[in-house]
Amino acid sequence: MSERTWSHLISALLNGTSLTADDTKWAMNEIMSGSATDAQIAGFAIALRAKGESVAEVRGLAQGMLDHAVTISVPGATLDIVGTGGDRAHTVNVSTMASIVASAAGARVVKHGNRAASSSCGTADVLERLGVIIDLDPADAVAVAEEVDITFCFAPLYHPSLKYAAKPRRELAVPTVFNFLGPLTNPARPTASAIGVFDRNMCEIMAGVFAERGVNALVFRGDDGLDELTTTTTSSVWIVADGSVRYEQLDPADLGIPRATPEALRGGDVEFNARVVREFLDGRPGPVRDAVLLNAAAALAAAEGVTGSLIETLRAQYQRAAEAVDSGAAKAKLDAWVESSQARAKQL
């Protein structure tokens, strides 16, 4: 698009014309610099959602957001495990527990997240209750990763310019592309990702962005609507490896995992969810353990790259995840993370 104005971009979207990555990067720059009005931000977000986002459009927006972010460099191969949220299922913190397990199994995890938006207890909320200092400055967050192979990037500290979109997003009160950019804008730019997405239409789009970046990833959605691999039914999985995307459906029964009920995975307030984390790390069997190990296995598979059979890869990684819990390594990992983050905070 030769002339970039809000009028031209929004008109194109309303006509059903897809924008280029440069167009949407320009739009995000206008938003993140505080130059866009609330009406322009809202109009753009709704027009894009109504047309349906493309890979190029989302890639441009994510790049524009990263251009305005506080980024960090964590040495070595890194992994993010996160869900977009928005499924309104109010489950326990599956991806948070899976992150701890994956790190205990040998991955270096850089988790990027925020407080609860659509649930009662977000990643930041439960980690804080467990004793992790969630708002370390970037240098200390990197140091914690180097020391214990897991760290947390509290989104508001790394994406301060996102405040300019807060009011129109809040007033719209419907999902837009902003709800899906978090997993694509981890400030550490991890080399692998395991991403749960509540909107099926966005799964392939987000997988396409990872493919264009050359990042190994698993993007998935429970066929019950969860933004994680579910154990209540099958899940849809988009496998990103070597710059290409392929789709598979996963049935946890093929791994010997019994069907769970939605109620068995439901969480509560921060006290309840923190207790669930502790019980899981202490080795409590049941549906929560099954779901967490499955998602940890997916994360470990993403970190290594899935080039062959998904089910066989997950089978091996599931055993690896189970061993990390049963040996006490996962519980020790959380304790080490708490200790390292608190030590850094005391130095401030």
UniProtKB/Swiss-Prot annotation:
List of residues binding anthranilate 1: G83, N114
Cofactor: Mg(2+)
Gene Ontology cellular-component annotations: cytosol
Keywords, ordered alphabetically: Amino-acid biosynthesis, Aromatic amino acid biosynthesis, Glycosyltransferase, Magnesium, Metal-binding, Transferase, Tryptophan biosynthesis
Biological processes annotated in GO: L-tryptophan biosynthetic process
InterPro entries reported for this sequence: Anthranilate_Pribosyl_Tfrase (IPR005940), Glycosyl_Trfase_fam3 (IPR000312), Glycosyl_Trfase_fam3_N_dom (IPR017459), Glycosyl_Trfase_fam3_N_dom_sf (IPR036320), Nuc_phospho_transferase (IPR035902)
Positions contributing to Mg(2+) 1 binding: S95, E228
The enzyme's E.C. designation: 2.4.2.18
Pfam families referenced in this protein's UniProt entry, alphabetically: Glycos_trans_3N, Glycos_transf_3
Record-stated family: Belongs to the anthranilate phosphoribosyltransferase family.
Protein name: Anthranilate phosphoribosyltransferase
